[in-house]
Amino acid sequence: MLTKRIIPCLDVDHGRVKKGINFVQLKDVGDPVAIAKAYQEQGADELVFLDITATNEARGTLVQTVEAVANQVFMPLTVGGGIQSVADMHALLRAGADKVSLNSAAVADPSLLTAGAEKFGRQAIVAAIDTRWQADQNRYQVTVNGGRTPVDLDAITWAKQAVAAGAGELLVTSMDADGTESGFDLRLYQQLTAAVQVPIIASGGAGSTADFVQLFTQTTVSAGLAASIFHFGELTVPQVKTALKQAKVAVR
């Protein structure tokens, strides 16, 4: 039985972690290496790093940051934000990322997923999808540019296309649930897991251990991702895993 993964997410801005973090034991709450090590000690299964500046001037900083984290941390690292080319992917993978995540650039040009998968293998290519429920169309709509720009594209359709193009995993964020701490959008993940056969990371809405239990007992996603609840110390990774074990969900 495949174990379910718990994945903290770090938003990095010019080499510093943002979104406010108050790990009590950390002197420098903005240092990605210190924060990554703290999550490793907690038993996180993977880490996702999203470069939110993702401009060309910040690109070099991101490579250095990934290198510094990869030297200190032994769990898989997925890095995304502003990846525009196979060369960008190569630089991050060479710096120590295990997987690269493409979002807006892949929507604009799905052949990027294909090129990445051909060069580095599908397992290294993650398609990140930010979506909102569009009630008048009765569908989940794809958004790009950090969820700010809606695209006339059905998220389930795009998930299938991304997998066909070469994505070996999907990281899907419900922009409606994101930051609310009111639970994952179960309907979204039920539809996605019925539509594609690759692992799916669910993101957006985690607020309690019960939310993770619900996610893994009511959908077949592979992983649950969260940022604020872990950063603010509202929940720890061990607390989530303990609750999952009690609910008979297999975790590492």
Swiss-Prot record:
- Annotated coiled-coil positions are none
Q: Which GO terms describe its cellular component?
A: cytoplasm
Instruction: Cite the Gene3D superfamilies for this sequence.
Output: Aldolase class I
Q: Name one GO molecular function term.
A: lyase activity
Q: For this UniProt record, give its keywords in alphabetical order, as a comma-separated list.
A: Amino-acid biosynthesis, Cytoplasm, Histidine biosynthesis, Lyase
E.C. number, please?
A: 4.3.2.10
Top-rank EC class of the record's enzyme: lyase
Q: Which InterPro entries does this chain map to?
A: Aldolase_TIM, His_biosynth, HisF, IGPS_HisA/HisF, RibuloseP-bd_barrel
One GO BP annotation is: L-histidine biosynthetic process
**What subcellular locations does the record give?**
Cytoplasm
**Active-site residue list:** 11, 130
Q: In which pathway does it act?
A: Amino-acid biosynthesis; L-histidine biosynthesis; L-histidine from 5-phospho-alpha-D-ribose 1-diphosphate: step 5/9
- Kindly give the SUPFAM superfamilies that the UniProt entry links to this protein: Ribulose-phoshate binding barrel
Catalytic activity reads: 5-[(5-phospho-1-deoxy-D-ribulos-1-ylimino)methylamino]-1-(5-phospho-beta-D-ribosyl)imidazole-4-carboxamide + L-glutamine = D-erythro-1-(imidazol-4-yl)glycerol 3-phosphate + 5-amino-1-(5-phospho-beta-D-ribosyl)imidazole-4-carboxamide + L-glutamate + H(+)
The family annotation for this protein states: Belongs to the HisA/HisF family.
Q: Subunit comment for this entry?
A: Heterodimer of HisH and HisF.
Q: What does this protein do?
A: IGPS catalyzes the conversion of PRFAR and glutamine to IGP, AICAR and glutamate. The HisF subunit catalyzes the cyclization activity that produces IGP and AICAR from PRFAR using the ammonia provided by the HisH subunit.
Name of the protein in its database record: Imidazole glycerol phosphate synthase subunit HisF
- Coding gene? hisF
